[in-house]
A protein has these predicted regions:
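Soluble catalytic domains of enzymes that build or remodel membrane lipids, polysaccharides, and related
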Residues: 57-210
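Non-catalytic terminal accessory segments
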Residues: 1-43
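Short, charge-rich amphipathic segments
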Residues: 9-24, 48-55, 79-92
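Hydrophobic alpha-helical transmembrane segments in integral membrane proteins
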Residues: 32-56, 73-78
Length: 210
């Protein structure tokens, strides 16, 4: 090995242009490796972020948001169940699943079992789901064992509410779920004003009714 290294070093000294090319190539490999390593770390390293928002229109409300799991690509069902058990300890008022929970690489069994795991999270007012571009959009299920309607049926079977241009009014809050912008098809998503009009009159704020 040392002999090969010395021969390589001698060649680079005799031909400077190759030394520049070699150095540039090594630098590119190192940068790429660091970039991929950083991405892999972020995929596998789940971080909880807390936001404390103030409003005089609602009493204390704990909302748990989960997004971009890309099941089986970045997270196994076993890992997800462990996190769901931990999140249950938060005793959230409601849980929102905001897209790309699944993608085209998620096996059917993992989609089904992940839906069960997510449904097991302890909450007071329900679990709500909106599609992302990998759930029901431009990248959705191109080579998958299942489609968006299978996702909907499985989630709803487990008691998770799918919101696609729909409104749910709870005692102290209105939840609006929009259709993903990347998948309009022949049925464009509703505007914000149209969705607001779907809120029952007795659940609207004074600003909206005026």
């Amino acid at each position: 090995v040392m002999l090969l290294f010395e021969l390589l070093n001698l060649g680079l000294k005799r031909f400077p242009i190759y030394r520049i090319s070699f150095t540039t190539g090594i630098l590119g490999i190192v940068v790429t490796a660091l970039f991929l390593g950083y991405g892999y770390y972020n995929i596998k390293h789940v971080v909880a972020t807390t936001y404390d928002l103030k409003s005089d229109k609602v009493e204390d409300l704990k909302i748990l948001e989960i997004a971009d799991l890309h099941m089986s690509t970045s997270l196994s069902v076993t890992e997800l169940q462990k996190y769901c058990d931990e999140m249950s300890q938060l005793n959230a008022d409601l849980v929102v699943l905001t897209g790309d929970i699944f993608d085209e690489n998620t096996p059917l069994d993992d989609m089904v079992n992940a839906s069960k795991a997510l449904a097991s999270i302890n909450n007071q007012q329900g679990i709500y789901y909106v599609y992302g571009n990998h759930d029901n959009g431009s990248h959705a299920f191109s080579d998958s064992e299942f489609g968006p309607e299978d996702v909907r049926a499985t989630l709803e079977k487990n008691g998770i509410v799918v919101l696609e241009d729909a409104v749910v009014s709870l005692d102290n809050i209105n939840i609006i779920g929009r259709k993903d912008a990347s998948f309009w098809g022949t049925n464009p998503r509703l505007s914000t004003s149209q969705l607001l009009e779907m809120i029952p009159e007795n659940k609207r704020s004074e600003e909206h009714t005026s």
